[in-house]
A protein has these predicted regions:
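Hydrophobic anchor residue at the start of the ABC signature
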Residues: 57, 85
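Conserved ABC ATPase signature
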Residues: 43-47, 51
């Protein structure tokens, strides 16, 4: 059940003095991620993809970490659900001060959620900078290639958009 999934970290580290305290912490996490106490008694297959991500976020938050590594955390979700999850992550970050290492291929989402960006190519970090530095003035040819591949929402601009080709050989 969801209560056991979210409470696993508490159980492993014996971070409570009573079952009531354990459950109250779990209920607080559920509410923080936009779910209700009643969801605790349900099974994962009874939830949508977005709700499952919220459960995963609650599970990650239950031990009060300083950093969460989110590896392709939203890639399997519909665009509208992606936005909800990322907005939730930003809200939680503002409330708790938590940091995220957000790993993704969706550059528009990376731009939206990130303060600083690192660009990896073939397992190597090829460029780092603030979001503005990377998007406004990319230095590495691979970064330039990635950014030039982002479609523009304006059809007129998109029609004349030039892509930057990067030959990594």
């Amino acid at each position: 059940k969801v209560i056991d999934i979210i409470g696993q970290g508490l159980d492993i580290h014996k971070s409570y003095s009573s079952i009531e305290e354990r459950n109250e912490k779990i209920y607080e996490m559920l509410e923080l991620v936009g779910l209700s106490r009643e969801h605790a008694s349900r099974y994962p297959h009874q939830f949508s993809g977005g709700q499952r991500q919220r459960i995963g976020i609650a599970r990650a938050l239950i031990m009060n970490p300083d950093l969460i590594i989110a590896d392709e955390a939203i890639s399997a979700l519909d665009v509208s659900i992606q936005a909800q999850v990322v907005n939730l992550m930003k809200k939680i970050q503002k409330e708790t001060g938590i940091a995220y290492l957000f790993i993704a291929h969706d550059l528009s989402m990376v731009k939206y959620i990130s303060d600083k960006i690192g660009v990896l190519h073939l397992g190597h970090l090829v460029e780092t900078g603030t979001t503005e530095e990377i998007f406004d003035n990319p230095i590495h040819p691979y970064t330039k290639s990635l950014l030039s591949a982002i479609p523009h929402p304006n059809p007129r601009v998109e029609k004349v958009r030039k892509s930057f080709t990067y030959d990594y050989k």
